[in-house]
Amino acid sequence: MPLVKKAKEMGLEVHCFAWEEGAVCKDIVNYFYPISIVEKEEILKICQEVDIDGICTIASDVAAPTVAYVANKMNLVGNNYEAAVRANNKYQMREAFVKVGVPCPKYMMVTPETLRSPEVIDALREFQYPMITKPSDRSGSLGVTKIVMPSQFYPAVEFAMEKSFKHQAMIEEFVEGREISVEFISYNGVHYPLQITDKITTEAPHFVELEHHQPSTLSDEMFTTIYDITKNALNALGLTNGASHAEYKITKDGRIAIMEIGGRMGGDFIGSALVRLSTGYDFVKGVIDVALGVFVVPVKTLNMCAGVYFLCKETEHLKSIVESWSDNPAFVEGEITDTELREVTCSADRSGYVIYQGKTKLKV
């Protein structure tokens, strides 16, 4: 919705492709097509008939390859299709990082056919518990599990493969440390850093995100280091245009490990709201400008704090705060999205949120 609303605000004719069920943009776009976002040939045909001027997505990993494919075929501004596919596969991503020395956790990929093979069993000797398993091609904490003992290994990996589109699971070294994410916007291979976010998650086994706060409390020196690593990671993947969102762990002894990077802005309101609230830069408009080939170098006009708290069973003390968010001038938006509060295993299990902006971090 933020992308569609911004495009309409800019006076653009908006064509949207999505599954019809739950398509919240259906009634406000100029043209809606009930087509799966992975149907790249069908989408390309329509885009060619319309003769579009640009194509983009802001928070969908699944849509990113289709966006790149259409842009490439129509000579529009976008990422290379192969790069977009690479950024959508955690194994290919890690392989690209290792080739150029981008620091990341130890990893391997398994499939149902290889999981119990002698080669995989032998390779696992290089890992120690705890470890992490996750689908190779999903986001939003879906299918992510921390494995702390051998008896959990096969059920957790099989769970990750079930959640994967391609039935592939990553097995990773578990890195203990603080979590951050990084927002960039790129145009023609030049990468512009926008913000770093501190992240708070649930404990093991699923690590679902509960809070995001900008800017991070990292030192200026660490900001520079993280930005430099992210630029190298973007170059390694071949991502040259549009938004990107990188996730990191930083250990107590200062080790930095990039977990993954996506060719889209951060979800959970990070890209669509928090960057603008903390820096003054309209990230969503920037993504549209890139797609149209009219990009302007970002200018930060604010130096504020902004953040979001999510409501779920683990944070049920927030319920009254979210319900009455408009009574507090520090809050800019809030909503109860589900009256049932569930213990979360993925981001979709959360039941509401509240967003703040202020001169300092707001603790609730």
PLM regions: where:
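ATP-binding N-terminal substructure of ATP-dependent carboxylate-amine bond-forming enzymes
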Residues: 1-83, 113-115, 295-297, 340, ...
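Flexible, glycine/charged-enriched surface loops at secondary-structure junctions
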Residues: 170, 241-247, 297-302
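Peripheral (often C-terminal) accessory segments that flank ATP-dependent C-N-forming ligase machineries
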Residues: 99, 121, 286-364
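Active-site nucleotide/adenylate-binding loops and adjacent lid/helix of ATP-dependent enzymes
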Residues: 89-170, 176, 188, 216-228
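Conserved protein kinase catalytic/activation segment
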Residues: 254-256
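ATP-dependent carboxylate/phosphate-activation module, predominantly the ATP-grasp catalytic core
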Residues: 151, 173-239, 243, 250, ...
